[in-house]
Amino acid sequence: MASQGTKRSYEQMETGGERQNATEIRASVGRMVGGIGRFYIQMCTELKLSDYEGRLIQNSITIERMVLSAFDERRNKYLEEHPNAGKDPKKTGGPIYRRRDGKWVRELILYDKEEIRRIWRQANNGEDATAGLTHLMIWHSNLNDATYQRTRALVRTGMDPRMCSLMQGSTLPRRSGAAGAAVKGVGTMVMELIRMIKRGINDRNFWRGENGRRTRIAYERMCNILKGKFQTAAQRAMMDQVRESRNPGNAEIEDLIFLARSALILRGSVAHKSCLPACVYGLAVASGYDFEREGYSLVGIDPFRLLQNSQVFSLIRPNENPAHKSQLVWMACHSAAFEDLRVSSFIRGTRIVPRGQLSTRGVQIASNENMDTMDSNTLELRSRYWAIRTRSGGNTNQQRASAGQISVQPTFSVQRNLPFERATIMAAFTGNTEGRTSDMRTEIIRMMESARPEDVSFQGRGVFELSDEKATNPIVPSFDMSNEGSYFFGDNAEEFEN
């Protein structure tokens, strides 16, 4: 992208830092994940978890959620002002699973938020370490992206469920900052904006008064974030129109839905980061690894290397396939829910199956599920190769517009074609090119029509052996061009429910 020079790298966003050189970035990202690891170890000590229990991904998720809840200022304030919510505003907790007499038992724990905040700060040199919190949010978001479908949310905002590949980060909380904004897909931003506009249509005072001014600033900021994800002048110009509208209404919703559809071929730049469960960082810190000294990157070999050497367990329900559970978590760890399955399978070294064929439900266990029949298994999170994560949509010819597939937002910077059914996508663009954005719409449709599915994206980029940490010998895979690589094909996953 042309503006790359003015942007902070997403590791800098992640660590809240100003412009730094590569070594400083690696050190500050290392400090961030090291802090998560130290916090996790301390929590395991507090809860008296055995080594095995501490490696259980369900326990990791509970501990992560506790610290996120302890630092959720807005919700804490809300709970204090609305005591009828039936929750103690000062406490947080969740299910912890322990091994007793050859069986898994669930124990509900409750902690003072103040205590959790103290442990977190202590693990992070006395700082609030917001970057580490955001990192955990992104890991949860990536897990949701791989596990649940958002058909209902898409339909509610007037979008097409086939646009699911644009929905990365749709469950990220609002407070996830710049690092969170970087990983949100085009569809996620569009959906947030549409919800806002709809509120404005239904509530006369939404844009008025002191509050309305703040709302307006938030609206324009979200528009700018979305504009920054688009890579063609016409799409950006349309975003300017949406942002500058005096009184956003149905015309803007139309424009946004048009833009979301166009992103299926003229893809936006969306960042991808490998965010791992807290227990993985905990294991490394416990074994004496010094993240800050060694440095760490979320987009290079480091997460792959960490997963090669970590043993993480998961609870498995009676009729679930452990290999499928592993696939789900592997995809979440590498933010690969929207990646082409041909590419993911090649990197992982085992075939990755579409979600409709998975015999596994989500990782988290509901409180009403019977623990007597639960088993646990090792998650297979290793990979055959590693590849650099991308933040571009994989558009060819000078990062302009090119082919896209109705269900892919590339994660790995690896050469491939992006197969797509142009007819399916173009069918959505019949007719409406009149109105104030007509010339831009016409231009966008023209670019989409000239896109060729056989064009190669990420020309010359390959995967690397795990021994090749300096990325010197790219191995460029060749893929079967005809094999469509959508994870959401024949989808039957459950909906995401808050």
From Swiss-Prot:
A motif (Bipartite nuclear localization signal) lies at residues 198-216. Pfam families: Flu_NP. One of its GO terms (biological process) is symbiont entry into host cell. Disulfide bonds: none annotated. Keywords: Capsid protein, Helical capsid protein, Host nucleus, Host-virus interaction, Ribonucleoprotein, RNA-binding, Viral nucleoprotein, Viral penetration into host nucleus, Virion, Virus entry into host cell. InterPro entries: Flu_NP. The keyword Ribonucleoprotein applies. Late in virus-infected cells, may be cleaved from a 56-kDa protein to a 53-kDa protein by a cellular caspase. This cleavage might be a marker for the onset of apoptosis in infected cells or have a specific function in virus host interaction. The keyword Amino-acid biosynthesis does not apply. Residues 1-21 are annotated as: Disordered. GO terms for molecular function: RNA binding; structural molecule activity. One of its GO terms (cellular component) is viral nucleocapsid. A motif (Unconventional nuclear localization signal) lies at residues 1-18. It is found in: Virion; Host nucleus. HAMAP family: INFV_NCAP (MF_04070). Belongs to the influenza viruses nucleoprotein family. Encapsidates the negative strand viral RNA, protecting it from nucleases. The encapsidated genomic RNA is termed the ribonucleoprotein (RNP) and serves as template for transcription and replication. The RNP needs to be localized in the host nucleus to start an infectious cycle, but is too large to diffuse through the nuclear pore complex. NP comprises at least 2 nuclear localization signals that are responsible for the active RNP import into the nucleus through cellular importin alpha/beta pathway. Homomultimerizes to form the nucleocapsid. May bind host exportin-1/XPO1. Binds to viral genomic RNA. Protein-RNA contacts are mediated by a combination of electrostatic interactions between positively charged residues and the phosphate backbone and planar interactions between aromatic side chains and bases. This is Nucleoprotein. It comes from Influenza A virus (strain A/Chicken/Hong Kong/YU562/2001 H5N1 genotype B). The lineage of its organism: Viruses, Riboviria, Orthornavirae, Negarnaviricota, Polyploviricotina.
